[in-house]
Every structure is written in C-alpha cells, then in structure tokens.
Amino acid sequence: MGCGASKVDKEGQARNDAIDAQLKKDRLAQKNEIKMLLLGAGESGKSTILKQMKLINHGSYSAEERESYKEIIFSNTVQSMRVLLDAMERLDIPLADATNAPRAEIILGLSPSIESSVLPRQVADAIHALWGDAGVQACFGRSREYQLNDSAKYYFDSIQRMAEPSYLPTDQDVLRSRVKTTGITETHFKIGELNYKLFDVGGQRSERKKWIHCFENVTAIIFLVAISEYDQLLYEDENVNRMQEALTLFDSICNSRWFVKTSIILFLNKIDLFKQKLPISPMADYFSDYTGGADYNSASEYIVNRFVSLNQSDAKTIYTHFTCATDTSQIKFVMSAVNDIIIQVNLRDCGLL
C-alpha cells in the first residue's frame, strides 16, 4: 500500500511539475510577445511600414509575390494619370501639345483597374508622352488641389521600364503600390528576443469604429502622420485639412481612456516630400501661428510640438521619429530604436526600471 501510494504521489508530482514548467514557459512567451497598434489617418504610410517589416524580417519578395503586384502597380499608374487628366479639365489647364489629345483619350477610355500581367505598349507610350507635356506638369504642380497618389511621379518616371515584357516589380515598386486597407490586418515579426504582433487598421474615417477590437493589452502604439500633407485636404471630406485631421485623431487616441499609460511612438512620415514642398507651399498659409518660413528644422519642430503638446497624461511618454517609409535602410534603423523603446517599456511595466 505504502509503495503504491508513493508511486501515485510521484506521478502526481511529475504532472504538477510539468504543468508548472509549461505555465512558466507560457508566461515567458507572453512576456516576449509584443502587441502594437499601427494607427494614423488614411494614406499616412501604414501599409508601407508593414511591407518594410516583411522586407527587413523575412527578406526580399519572391518572384511569385512580385508578379502578384503587377496589376496593382499598373492600375495605380493608370488611375494616377486619369486623376491628372480629370484635374486638368476641372482646373481649366489645357494640354501644351495638342497632339497629345488622342493619348489622353486612350487613358481616359481605360478601365481604372488593369487586369493584365503586361502593360500594353500603347498605354505606356501614352503615359510617357503625357507626362512630358507641359500642361500635365503644370497640373501636377497643383496636386494639393485634388487627390493624387504620392507614387504617381515615381511610376510615371518608370513607365518605360514597367512596359518591358520581362518586367518584374522591384522592392521599391512594391513598396510604393497602393491598396486601400479595410478591416484589420495582423503582421508578425521578430526583433532580437521579442516577437511582435503589429495590427494595422483602416485609416479612413469609415474604418475607425473597428479599432476597438485591437485595444486590449497593447504594449505601445505606432502613430503615423504624413507631414507632407499639411497643405492637402481629406479624401473623404475636401473641407478638412489633412494635418488638422491627423491632430484631431492623435488627440483622441493619445487621451483615450484605453491608452492612459500606453506609450506612443510618433512617426512623422514622408519627410522627403515634406522637404520638397516647403519652399513652394508656405506652411504659414495653413497654420497661421507658424513663423519659420521654408526652413525644414523649424517646420519639423513646429509639427512635433503641435502633436506632443496634445498629451494630457504625465504617465504617458511620446517618442518621435522622422521617417521616409519607402527608405528600407532608414526604417530598419528606426525599428531598431523602437525595439529599444519596447524593452524599456517592458522593464518599466515589470517594475525593473
């Protein structure tokens, strides 16, 4: 009897030890699992950041993946030229070269969605000729007055390469492609010992009510702002300045009861376009209290202060980074800095800092 009881006790202890070991392993895994929300207004660059995470952590795109982006890239390019041509009519800007009129008709007669693995040479030649037209260039110079994708110039400049029968999109081609995000997407990647789950939600106003599902147990928020859009209007409401919308959204997220102590990492994105735009579109025209002229340092400091000053909580830290989401090496450096921030946040939450 005694020996039998002893055997049962040993088996029970072994099971308990196994359960304890598994619980310890689960706690350790949970500690190393980081949930982050990727937030920001529409077209701020969130999807591009997610593509960069794939490039940085999983390597370059496969040939099959590149092939799958061709229709998106072709459609983005054609849609952008259609937007330009429509804007020319609305703004009463004529083509400088009348012989380009039939080429404009070719583009306007196309479906907005190109369902082909090869860009027709006639379409590519039409876009190439139109992009060289002084009237089209004049309209492009007024792109803040209508809704044009940031990638338009890049794709127009690359149109002959894209029309080659052997064309396969480069990483940069893929990074600049645009598909509206709807619903919630989840991206997994690892930096050092930490396993990240990064949730991207639709940035357009109609998508925001869906964010609530991502809120629980979030370690930190990455909030993206396209600082180059200080002179542009919303896609959904052309009476609202995009930067003002971003400020309003940041205020609501930063001071939400869901995020009282949640650290926010602010990515001030599209600095390349911002630098190009400052000398030709005075920021003071849109923010009357700005007095720094076209100086990049003054303008960027002003925008940082506008966002950071909205924070009403002493318990919350806001970390800022200036980014160009299409620059892989820069995003790799910034994400390394983000990882350091997350480690500090983890240590703080565990009472070790």
UniProtKB/Swiss-Prot annotation:
The gene is GPA1. One of its GO terms (biological process) is pheromone-dependent signal transduction involved in conjugation with cellular fusion. Residues 323-328 are annotated as: G5 motif. Mg(2+) binds at S47, T181. Residues 32-353 form the G-alpha domain. This is Guanine nucleotide-binding protein alpha-1 subunit. SMART domains: G_alpha. A lipid is attached at C3 (S-palmitoyl cysteine).
